[in-house]
């Protein structure tokens, strides 16, 4: 499971679609609707949040916004916060999903690690996207601008829950 801290516009097609599916799974886990993945490290930051389902819904909305921008069709009815299930927060795109959800801090070291990880993955599977990614990174300028809209970049190293790999 990979729930990227990076802005969805930086993710290639495979990463964006996989992140959507895996975050929908995370939403189910946080609702207690599945027995698997309950101790997955990627869920730690959402569980630490006062309203984890609302945070996951806002995160999913950010992915869906990017999907819309690319002409993909992610089912927003699957986004839902609170106890009532799917569709509660996701169907209406007119209201910003981030308006009532305080930002979650993400260390710059985590963003840097994830960006390196993404670049490594993209280099092996989609050279065309690698070129686009480099242009998008240059346009953003600083690493802090590379965070998903739900996250706020703060000083720090890689998150303790991250299972790092050498590239």
Predicted regions and their residues:
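Sequence termini and other peripheral, non-core segments
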Residues: 1-16, 22-25, 29-33, 47-85, ...
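Conserved, mostly hydrophobic/aromatic
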Residues: 40
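Short conserved micro-motifs on helix faces and helix-strand junctions that flank
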Residues: 35-37
């Amino acid at each position: 499971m990979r729930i990227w801290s990076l802005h969805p516009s930086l993710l290639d097609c495979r990463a964006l679609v996989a992140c959507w599916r895996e975050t929908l799974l995370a939403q189910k886990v946080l609702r207690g609707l599945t027995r698997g993945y309950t101790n997955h490290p990627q869920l730690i930051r959402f569980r630490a949040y006062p309203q984890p389902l609302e945070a996951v819904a806002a995160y999913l909305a950010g992915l869906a916004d990017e999907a819309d921008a690319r002409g993909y069709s992610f089912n927003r009815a699957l986004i839902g916060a609170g106890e009532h299930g799917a569709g509660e927060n996701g169907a209406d795109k007119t209201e910003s999903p981030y308006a009532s959800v305080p930002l979650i801090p993400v260390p710059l070291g985590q963003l840097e690690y994830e960006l390196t990880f993404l670049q490594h993955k993209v280099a092996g599977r989609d050279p065309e996207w690698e070129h686009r990614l480099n242009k998008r990174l240059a346009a953003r300028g600083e690493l802090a601008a590379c965070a998903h809209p739900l996250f706020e970049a703060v000083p720090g190293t890689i998150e303790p829950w991250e299972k790092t790999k050498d590239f």
